[in-house]
Amino acid sequence: MNRRNFIKRSTAITGGLALSGFGSTLLSGSDNLPFKISLAEWSLHRALGKKEINHLDFAAIAKKEFGISAVEYVNTFFFEKANDHKYLSEMKRRVDDLGSKSLLIMCDNEGNLGDPDNKKRAQAIENHYKWTEAAKYLGCHSIRVNARSEGSWDDQIELAADGLRRLNEFGDSIGINTIVENHGGLSSNGKWLSAVMERVDHSRVGTLPDFGNFRIQGDEWYDRYQGMKELMPYAKAVSAKSHEFDEKGNETGSDFYRIMNIVLDAGYKGYVGIEYEGSVHTEMEGIRLTNNLLKIIRDSI
């Protein structure tokens, strides 16, 4: 979809929503913007890994370098601090002082909630409790988890649904959502992950559709546009994954206009999180390019 067609579609949608009386509801979470922009910490994973920047400075970098006031954490950058109240308090203080928001924690290296081994699955569930509590303390709405599994199509649905359902019993008790990203294996198959969502069938369990993470394995890819359509009905967050950009400022692997069309058509009114993962541009440049593209799309509506 080109920009002209996107503008026409967006104008029709926003006009129709206003006439129906639903427009104010759709936009209320975004201060009269069709969507707000957040920054995922993974966008700076190389700098963080090299200790060029400190995790505690992430929110300040988002605000001061990019004008972004909402952040999404990755647990591996403060992996030993989930139960460190002093550290979490410092994180919270810095975000509050900036007038920013903590949205979610992306959780990795804690096991797979769909593990076919009952003991490993139970351990993975338990491993996520501390991150659920940390998310609550920081003011986040969700933790992002991995539902990777093994076995047949149906077996993996049942296993992943079991792990999510059991973890959600804890998350729901303290008001934290449990959301699944398309993150490899069958989780990158939109039809499969949608089936998992239907199987769990709980308002606090949802998806985090990622524009680019539709690689199932090796050279096997799921159609990203079809996948986004299938996952958006359950979305509680969205990741604008980006890699490289052309001379016009467009992302070369994903048609951002087309995907944002899908996102808005689903009635989504939350944050769209920048998640730059490219190698041609520096991380700072990649974040700026992604931010600029999302702003152009937003301003076109």
Whereabouts are the PLM-identified features?
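Conserved active-site loop/cleft motifs that coordinate metal ions or position small ligands
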Residues: 240, 270-277
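N-terminal pre-domain/capping segments
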Residues: 2-137, 155, 172, 202, ...
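Short, conserved glycine- and acidic-residue-centered signature motifs
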Residues: 55, 124, 160, 224, ...
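Hydrophobic residues within beta-strands of alpha/beta enzymes
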Residues: 71, 103-105, 143, 178, ...
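A short helix->loop->beta-strand "cap" motif at the edges of active sites that frequently abuts
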Residues: 100, 176, 266-270
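Active-site groove signature of glycoside hydrolases
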Residues: 135-154, 179-183
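Acidic/histidine-rich catalytic cores of soluble enzymes
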Residues: 70-71, 164-261
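Active-site cleft segment of glycoside hydrolase catalytic domains centered on the general acid/base Glu
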Residues: 150-164
